[in-house]
Amino acid sequence: MLKLQGEDEAAQLAPRRARVPVPRPTAPDVSPSSARLGLACLLLLLLLTLPARVDTSWWYIGALGARVICDNIPGLVSRQRQLCQRYPDIMRSVGEGAREWIRECQHQFRHHRWNCTTLDRDHTVFGRAMLRSSREAAFVYAISSAGVVHAITRACSQGELSVCSCDPYTRGRHHDQRGDFDWGGCSDNIHYGVRFAKAFVDAKEKRLKDARALMNLHNNRCGRTAVRRFLKLECKCHGVSGSCTLRTCWRALSDFRRTGDYLRRRYDGAVQVTATQDGANFTAARQGYRHATRTDLVYFDNSPDYCVLDKAAGSLGTAGRVCSKTSKGTDGCEIMCCGRGYDTTRVTRVTQCECKFHWCCAVRCKECRNTVDVHTCKAPKKAEWLDQT
């Protein structure tokens, strides 16, 4: 190896540096309690950095009206946003379906402590109530999925969507208990409604892939199959004097109320489950409990009693709710008010009565005034309320 001229001189002229011993770092004396505290802090940091389950979802589309702007819908995952941008007409139907299933949910639970109340201008629609894996969450996921199927299927058959129309599979000759008939008319395209609802509604759960996602996917499927369950056969007779020698039939959606009633019964018989270790299926929550079938709604957590305002549990309480003084059911004051008692207010209601038809062409009614007692649940005591918030 060649050395540059003067390199040796420079080496000789350079002062020799004394070697200073460097102390080796020693491990700090850490007590077991400090170690546990550090581990807890690390776990907390990991939990904060992991994506949390937030039920801001496509449900908010129902609050946007006819003008659905995909980028302004909070909570959509990328697949849902892609479908929204590609099919804006279908998104309007999804919004109509959202409004319909929320109305149906509120009808089904109008006499219960939890009455499917929505929160204005809240992207989660129900607040924190759906974060708990409860019966109520099971019902909401099922009926929301059913609402999308029903709305899209109806829009297809009514010619409101360019991507679908009548059911293309109902063609040719068929038979039922009354005999042979020809498929005709415009059968509701349930196949397209189910297919799009599955792709759109299930997209978020398929992305998360946790136990709650498995529960939601199961209940979503229950909702879709419920709509298909109540397809009805409508027919028109052809023949001399309506003899019905030839029938033309088509499949039609039933009123959404039938789906709501059915899912309400499924709610009453919902099965409490736990996820299996591999996270691919369910097992009964306790030994001796029956196993869930494909038509059962499933849930993990017991519901709160919904008696008092509890923001953490998503409970709005029953203070001020109207109740029946004489009923022994869930709408009765004893159950609705959770034993807190009720207030009675006398109110006068004005209704139309003694209506008569006058030629031509008007209906004239009188105004009738009725004084009735309205019973409303008392608010809990202040100390009790503070304990729950």
From Swiss-Prot:
Glycans are attached at residues 115, 281. One of its GO terms (biological process) is signal transduction. InterPro entries: Wnt (IPR005817), Wnt2 (IPR009140), Wnt_C (IPR043158), Wnt_CS (IPR018161). Forms a soluble 1:1 complex with AFM; this prevents oligomerization and is required for prolonged biological activity. The complex with AFM may represent the physiological form in body fluids. Interacts with FZD4 and FZD5. Keywords: Developmental protein, Disulfide bond, Extracellular matrix, Glycoprotein, Lipoprotein, Secreted, Signal, Wnt signaling pathway. Disulfide bonds join 105-116, 156-164, 166-186, 235-249, 237-244, 307-338, 323-333, 337-377, 353-368, 355-365, 360-361. This is Protein Wnt-2b. Ligand for members of the frizzled family of seven transmembrane receptors. Functions in the canonical Wnt/beta-catenin signaling pathway. Plays a redundant role in embryonic lung development. It is found in: Secreted, Extracellular space, Extracellular matrix; Secreted. The keyword Signal applies. The gene is Wnt2b. GO terms for molecular function: signaling receptor binding. Residues 1-33 are annotated as: Disordered. The lineage of its organism: Eukaryota, Metazoa, Chordata, Craniata, Vertebrata. Disruption phenotype: No visible phenotype at birth. Combined disruption of Wnt2 and Wnt2b leads to lung agenesis. PANTHER family: PROTEIN WNT-2B (PTHR12027:SF93), WNT RELATED (PTHR12027).
